């Protein structure tokens, strides 16, 4: 790394030293380990979605075609690394604990990545403070315990660990750094496609410009052209690797590009006028880090080496504001209506951490223990509020029992027909995970190809009423074509939908979960058959999908362990201690 590092002697006080990385990892274990053992993320918004994907890989590793949603869709539309590791661990731990374990790995990798990323700009001590801060970030707790965005957190952690190797390669032409950086970036891409397409650019550009500024530092003797040419080599190799590792993903995107009406999302709101969404998507994720914004702006603009990082942070900060400013829509174009913007707030928080670590260093140097206690209190409050926030800002109803629904679908040949759930929320994915029958609905919007779902601008049919006229029109269209899809059974957890079902010819037959769920059926429906929507992956694509993405993560681990980092060793020359006793003078002999 290029930032100066202070080698401390034996007499430096504890508050004057960098926090060892081992201690930071133990702190992450202490803070998040108990929450994960309590399985708090199980109630997060997308947790059941990721378990659904993982359950399919656990049973059909080399066949990414999943018939359970949308009358059949290809899981090559979502990078598989997270789900494949969950699938492997699920054979020993079950799906719930497998999810917790992979999330814990992501949480442990994040402070390591933040430390290494921050060391590009700040000292070892400031970087260690930044790494500690990453454990308590409100945006991390928001994604883990409310949003359930496990792929996003793992992809960001892997990317942050890989970019310092890109920095070393660009400045020093170190081939070890090239190999390790490429492997980690490919593993990050195999975890989450949005992090690859948008996050990698936002995180990497400050690193590139800093490498140009630092081309002569620490005995390096590179030219601007040399740094840029090596960066181009890295980019070309990365694109080639992505083309191979994620080939089925690009092929699926080519055959079925996303062409559907935009689906509303609260993160695209104006946070100044919609105060509730501003709290949820900005204030809670940023927490006490908002107090550091003046320092970030002043220090980031005043020092030349920090400006690339600051400009990257500033752009990501603005993007994280969603529809509050027109800039995201101008920059992203049609992607604006596809993306959700809580991920940009997470990335912006990560990019701010090196400067926040620098602020912590300044405060501790000046105020000592008082500053340390104050910073620890603010960090703890930030995380505590973010973890507790879903209790006060509920994103879905309390969980209810769906075991009887699953049992019905799995017996007496009921899985020959398709089904639909209404009012099930995130438990739609739980039913899909364990039921053998196929549904016309599903939670992964980008995989939808049924025209009734793509043309109305609403998300899941199970939540139709929350999308107003568009949602109800989509539901009516599906009910109208029930014969075409073999849709015979509808499970209702919200009486709001019952008049529509009765009018459309369905009849109430049974109730489950002490009357909270009712089963509606329609006579005369023929068994379901395959539809023409979607392109089934070939056997070769299945083999590539089942080996290359997870292989990239294994390769990254092996390269990091086998190719040691080339570190410049420094040695402290300590002055002898001063002896205050009077010297004994003797005559020379």
Mark where each language-model region is:
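Membrane-embedded transmembrane-helix bundle of lipid-linked glycan/lipid transferases
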Residues: 2-408, 430-433, 456, 481, ...
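Positions that flank functional sites
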Residues: 447, 497, 516
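Short, polar loop motifs at secondary-structure junctions
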Residues: 423-427, 493-498
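Short secondary-structure boundary/hinge segments and terminal tails
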Residues: 449-450, 500, 519
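Hydrophobic C-terminal alpha-helix "anchor/cap" residues
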Residues: 408-409, 501
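Extracytoplasmic/lumenal acceptor-recognition loop(s) of multi-pass membrane glycoenzymes
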Residues: 185, 379-392, 411-484, 526
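Short loop/helix-cap segments at secondary-structure boundaries that form the rim of catalytic
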Residues: 430-434, 499-504
């Amino acid at each position: 790394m290029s930032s100066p590092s202070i080698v401390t002697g034996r007499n430096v006080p504890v508050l004057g030293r960098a926090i060892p990385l081992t201690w930071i990892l133990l702190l992450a274990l202490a803070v998040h380990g108990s929450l994960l053992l309590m399985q708090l993320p199980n109630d997060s918004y997308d947790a059941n979605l990721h378990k659904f994907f993982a359950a399919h890989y656990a049973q059909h590793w080399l066949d990414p075609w999943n018939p359970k949603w949308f009358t059949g869709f290809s899981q090559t539309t979502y990078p598989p690394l997270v789900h494949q590791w969950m699938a492997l661990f699920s054979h020993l731990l079950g799906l719930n604990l497998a999810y917790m374990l992979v999330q814990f790995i992501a949480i442990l990798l994040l402070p390591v990545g933040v430390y290494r990323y921050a060391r590009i700009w700040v000292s070892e001590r400031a970087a260690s403070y930044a790494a500690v801060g990453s454990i308590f970030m409100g945006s991390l707790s928001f994604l883990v315990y409310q949003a359930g965005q496990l792929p996003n957190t793992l992809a960001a952690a892997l990317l942050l660990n890989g970019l310092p190797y890109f920095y070393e390669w660009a400045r020093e032409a170190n081939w070890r750094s090239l190999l390790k950086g490429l492997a980690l970036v490919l593993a990050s891409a195999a975890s989450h496609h949005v992090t690859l397409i948008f996050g990698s650019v936002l995180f990497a550009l400050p690193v590139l410009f800093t490498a140009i500024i630092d081309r002569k530092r620490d005995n390096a003797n590179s030219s601007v052209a040399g740094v840029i040419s090596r960066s181009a080599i890295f980019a070309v190799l990365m694109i080639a690797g992505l083309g191979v590792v994620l080939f089925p993903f690009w092929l699926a995107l080519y055959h079925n590009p996303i062409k559907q009406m935009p689906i509303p999302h609260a993160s695209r709101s104006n946070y100044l006028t919609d105060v509730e969404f501003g709290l949820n998507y900005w204030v809670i994720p940023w927490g006490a880090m908002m107090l550091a914004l003046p320092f970030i702006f002043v220090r980031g603009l005043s020092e030349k080496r920090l400006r690339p990082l600051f400009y990257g942070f500033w752009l990501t900060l603005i993007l994280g504001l969603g529809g509050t400013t027109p800039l995201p829509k101008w920059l992203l174009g049609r992607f604006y209506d596809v993306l959700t913007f809580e991920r940009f707030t997470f990335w912006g928080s990560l990019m701010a951490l090196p400067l926040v670590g620098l602020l912590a260093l300044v405060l501790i140097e000046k105020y000592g223990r008082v500053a340390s206690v104050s910073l620890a209190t603010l960090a703890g409050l930030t995380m505590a509020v973010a973890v507790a926030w879903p209790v006060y800002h509920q994103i879905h109803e309390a969980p209810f029992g769906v075991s009887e629904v699953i049992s019905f679908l799995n017996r007496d040949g009921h899985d020959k027909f398709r089904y639909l759930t209404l009012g099930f929320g995130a438990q739609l994915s739980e039913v899909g995970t364990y039921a053998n029958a196929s549904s016309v609905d599903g939670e992964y919007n980008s995989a939808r190809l049924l025209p009734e779902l793509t043309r109305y601008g609403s998300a899941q049919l199970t939540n139709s009423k929350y999308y107003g006229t568009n949602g109800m029109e989509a539901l009516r269209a599906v009910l109208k074509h029930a014969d075409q899809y073999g849709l015979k059974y509808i499970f209702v957890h919200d009486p709001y939908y019952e008049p529509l079902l009765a009018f459309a010819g369905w009849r109430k037959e049974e109730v489950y979960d002490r009357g909270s769920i009712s089963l509606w059926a329609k006579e005369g429906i023929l068994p379901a058959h395959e539809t023409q929507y979607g392109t089934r992956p070939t056997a070769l694509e299945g083999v590539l999908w089942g080996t290359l993405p997870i292989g990239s993560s294994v390769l990254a681990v092996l390269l990091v362990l086998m190719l040691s980092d080339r570190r410049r060793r420094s040695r402290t020359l300590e002055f002898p201690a001063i002896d205050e006793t009077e010297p004994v003078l003797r005559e020379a002999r």
